[in-house]
Amino acid sequence: MRKKIISMLFCVVLLFSGLLAGCTAGEQNTNTGTFVLGKAPKYVFMLIGDGMSAVQINAAQVLNGNNTLGEISTNNLLFASFPACGMATTHDSTSFCPDSASTATAMSTGYKTHSGVIGMAVDKSTPVTNIAELLKAEGMKIGIISTVTINHATPAAYYAHVASRSDYYGIAMQMAESGFDFFAGGEISK
């Protein structure tokens, strides 16, 4: 199970790490880098395009494409040329239209749960261990950064276990008790 979670994390990091670079204008990056087998990475970043699917990727390709009469084409994003790509089924245990709580729980733990539930099994009372907790237990430093509030469902799925994504107090208390090394979040404008 741990190998499945680490493999899933690697694929997600690989897929989304190019999103920011692929969406920027400018010269193409020609740095191919190197990968050394057996050597552990110093840093691992997981970037989540919350709500992003093939439709949003295509919209970015169209936006960055060519709309000259007779020469219409899309512009491929950098991550679209990666040698490996992954796609995930995003329905949760109760809905074909899931929310951020259940999908982030699935990404962080490998378990599907109910919409609105963070870090708990289908019974809504059994906490399930997430990848950040596993890595912290291995002695790695953990930082969680978000453009939304840090107690939002997506970042919270990497440190909290609550039956309701609206339990902001419980989420905040678990953040403080997590022992993680760094947290930073944005705010939601209304």
What do these predicted ranges mean?
Residues 1-9:
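Bacterial N-terminal signal peptides that target proteins for export
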Residues 10, 14-18:
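Hydrophobic core
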Residues 27-189:
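N-terminal catalytic scaffold of extracellular/periplasmic and nuclease hydrolases
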Residues 20-22:
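C-terminal motif of bacterial Sec signal peptides marking the signal peptidase cleavage site
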